[in-house]
Amino acid sequence: LPGGSITQTLADGTVVTVNLTDESANISPSMGSTPLHRNVWVNGKAAVTLDGAGAKGATITPGYILACQVDFGAKGDAGASSKMTIDDESGNLVSGPLAGKSNGAITLGPGQAKNVTVLDLEKKDAYGGESHTGGNKFTGKTGSVTWADSTLGVSGCAGYAQARSYVKVAVSTDNVSSNVTLWGQPFSIG
């Protein structure tokens, strides 16, 4: 897949550049072993560069939109699991397996789509409970997220199935809060 790049200047002059590189998708047989199941392994790297006096960091949220042409009326399943590496401006590298799954009675009918984030980062909330986020926050002027062999799956899809990657970057400065979204090229998952 070709990946992509977008540069956007915010209202306060902060320049946000988002790059999606090393993007690939490998369609693989589903464990369901029927024409109604789709499975694909995806890889990619999202890198963000901020330029401007007010730029102090951002949150990178990579994910995929999954869609099905015809619904068979069965329950659906969409999920992602991966290994990721986070690199921030201070040179810190964090690597390890991540797992995220969004299960349930979803139905992907004509014209419907499901959002699946690649990351599922867990931390304690302000009250000591469990909190999950699909975005990786970094401080400084640069940050990146890399994912490898993340599995995306759809069940109950009787027609053409398609996916499209995205990288959403949330930037907050002293004067502005904004989101910049880079969309990847749509691809078939069977």
Question: Could you say what each language-model-derived stretch is?
Answer:
Residues 24-28, 58, 145-151:
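Short beta-strands within extracellular/lumenal beta-sheet-rich domains
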Residues 1-55:
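Extracytoplasmic low-complexity, Pro/Thr/Ser/Ala/Gly-rich segments
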Residues 49-102, 177-190:
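Exposed low-complexity, polar/acidic, P/S/T/G-rich flexible segments that act as propeptides
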Residues 78-144:
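Short helix-loop boundary/capping segments
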Residues 11, 21, 45, 51, ...:
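A structural detector for beta-sheet-dominated domains
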Residues 46, 62-64, 80-82, 102-104, ...:
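One face of beta-strands
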Residues 122-190:
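Extracellularly exposed regions in secreted/surface proteins, prominently low-complexity, repeat-rich
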